[in-house]
C-alpha cells in the first residue's frame, strides 16, 4: 500500500507494478521501507509466513517432510565483505605492516583475534581477518546444527575459500562459487588460474551432481565428507586443496562478531559496490 501511494497508484492498479521500470520500484521501496520497519511492519526478502510457509526453520523448526530431505549448504569466505577493492600487496606485506593495518579497525582486540584467525586459516594473510563474512556463515552454521538434530536425512556444510586472481588476490565474494558449481568458469575470466581453477571446478561440479543424484557429496580426490551431527559441524573447505575441518571457526566468530568491521569502513575513499 505504501509503495502504491508513493508511486501515485490506487490499490486497484496493483497489476501496473509489473509494468514499471525496476529503478522506479527500487526508489519507491527505499523511500517507504524505513518508516514501515520503524512501526514494526514487515520489510525483508523472504516469504511472509503463512499456512504454506510456516517460517524460518531455524526459528519455527523443520516440517516433517523437510526433515527427510538431505541438504548441502554452504557459503564463501568473504560474501558481502569482499565486494570492494582489494588490499594492495596483501601477500607480500610484512607481518608488522599487517598488524598495523588490523589495529586501525580492531584496536586492542587484534592480539586476541589474530591467533584465532591463523588457527583457522594457516598461511592466509592476517589482513583477511577483517574480510570475513559476517552475513551468512553464522546463520548457515545455525541452520546445519538445527537440521542435524533430525537424523532422518544428512546435512552437509561447505565453505568456499578460493582466492581470485584480481587486486593482488581477492578472497571469494558472494556467489563466487557458482561458476565452479555449474562448470562454466571458462566464461568468467576472473575465475581462471590455469591448472588450479579447472581442477577445483571439476571437483565442485562433480560433488554437486553426485549429491543431487545420491544425497552424498562425493568427487574424485575429495576427502571423506562427514555429515553434521549434534555436537559436530564438519565443514569442507573448497580451495586449491580441499579439506574437512570440524567446528573450526566457532571461537573465531565468537570473538570477532562483537567488533566486526563494516566493509565500507575498509576504504578511505567512497567506492561503488555492484552486485
For each feature predicted by the language model, list its residue ranges.
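Substrate-access "cap/lid" subdomains that shape
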Residues: 1-97, 126-150
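Alpha-helix boundary/capping residues
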Residues: 20-24, 29-33, 105, 120, ...
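Short coil/turn segments at secondary-structure boundaries
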Residues: 29-31, 114-119, 158-159
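Short Gly/aromatic-enriched secondary-structure transition segments
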Residues: 85-106, 223, 228
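Glycine-centered helix-coil hinge/cap
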Residues: 96, 103-118, 122
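Short glycine/proline-rich turn/loop motifs
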Residues: 113-126, 182-192
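Contiguous C-terminal substrate-recognition/catalytic subdomains in enzyme active sites
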Residues: 120-122, 126-134, 196-203
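Mobile gating loops/cap/lid regions near enzyme active sites that modulate substrate access
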Residues: 137-275
Amino acid at each position: 500500500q505504501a509503495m502504491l501511494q508513493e508511486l501515485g497508484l490506487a490499490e486497484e492498479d496493483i497489476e501496473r507494478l509489473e509494468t514499471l521500470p525496476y529503478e522506479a520500484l527500487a526508489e519507491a521501496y527505499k523511500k517507504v521501507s524505513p518508516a514501515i520497519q520503524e512501526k514494526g511492519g514487515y520489510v525483508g526478502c523472504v516469504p511472509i509466513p503463512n499456512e504454506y510457509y510456516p517460517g524460518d526453520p531455524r526459528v519455527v523448526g523443520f516440517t516433517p517432510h523437510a526433515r527427510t530431505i538431505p541438504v548441502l549448504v554452504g557459503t564463501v569466505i568473504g560474501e558481502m565483505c569482499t565486494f570492494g577493492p582489494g588490499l594492495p600487496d596483501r601477500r607480500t606485506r610484512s607481518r608488522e605492516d599487517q598488524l598495523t593495518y588490523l589495529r586501525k579497525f580492531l584496536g586492542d582486540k587484534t592480539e586476541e583475534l589474530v591467533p584465532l584467525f591463523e588457527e583457522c586459516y594457516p598461511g592466509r594473510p592476517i589482513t583477511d581477518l577483517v574480510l570475513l563474512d559476517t552475513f551468512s556463515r553464522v546463520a548457515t552454521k545455525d541452520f546445519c546444527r538445527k537440521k542435524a538434530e533430525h537424523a532422518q536425512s544428512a546435512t552437509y556444510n561447505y565453505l568456499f575459500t578460493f582466492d581470485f586472481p584480481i587486486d593482488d588476490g581477492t578472497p571469494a565474494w558472494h556467489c563466487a562459487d557458482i561458476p565452479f558449481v555449474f562448470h562454466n568458469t571458462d566464461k568468467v575470466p576472473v575465475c581462471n588460474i590455469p591448472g588450479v581453477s579447472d581442477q577445483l571446478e571439476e571437483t565442485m561440479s562433480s560433488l554437486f551432481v553426485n549429491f543431487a543424484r545420491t544425497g552424498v557429496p562425493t568427487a574424485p580426490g575429495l576427502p571423506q565428507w562427514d555429515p553434521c551431527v549434534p555436537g559436530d559441524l564438519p565443514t569442507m573447505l573448497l580451495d586449491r586443496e580441499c579439506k574437512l575441518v570440524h567446528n573450526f571457526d566457532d571461537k573465531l566468530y565468537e570473538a570477532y562478531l562483537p567488533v566486526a568491521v563494516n566493509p565500507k569502513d575498509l576504504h578511505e575513499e567512497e567506492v561503488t559496490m555492484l552486485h
